[in-house]
Regions:
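Ligand-binding "clamshell"
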Residues: 83, 96-104
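Sec/Tat signal peptide C-region and signal peptidase I cleavage site
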Residues: 17-23
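Hydrophobic helical h-region of N-terminal Sec-dependent signal peptides
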Residues: 9-17
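General helical structural elements
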Residues: 9-10, 44, 101
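General helical secondary-structure elements
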Residues: 1-2, 23, 93
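Bacterial N-terminal signal peptides that target proteins for export
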Residues: 1-9
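Ser/Thr-centric signal marking residues that sit
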Residues: 14, 25, 104
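Extracytoplasmic small-molecule ligand-binding "clamshell" domains
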Residues: 24-91
Length: 104
């Protein structure tokens, strides 16, 4: 749990310092199929821990964010293809993933 706090704090700081260079509305990439971290409720809205963290980061940066969902297997390629601006996922860091994206 302590590591997650450090990761989310680092993400908040990184996003906060770069917010001025970003669009007014950011696209938050999320899987939405891994409860309780992320999933869809009965109305089709994305909910869960990852979504709450993403919303808190956006509020802290004072920017509007929209949610873009992606299948897990395509989430890193979608980020690299700029289908969303940042990724919120309870994802373990592996050498393969570190080679593809930056973690904060």
């Amino acid at each position: 749990m302590q590591n997650y706090k450090k990761i989310f704090l680092a993400a908040a700081v990184t996003l906060a310092f770069s917010a001025g260079a970003m669009a007014e509305t950011l696209k938050m990439g999320i899987e939405a199929a891994y409860p309780p971290f992320n999933n869809k409720d009965a109305s089709g809205n994305v909910v869960g821990f990852d979504k709450e963290i993403g919303d808190a980061l956006c509020a802290k940066m004072k920017v509007e964010c929209t949610v873009v969902t992606s299948d897990w297997d395509g989430i890193i390629p979608a980020l690299n293809a700029k289908k969303f601006d940042f990724l919120i996922a309870s994802m373990s860091i592996t050498e393969e993933r570190q080679a593809a994206v930056d973690f904060t």
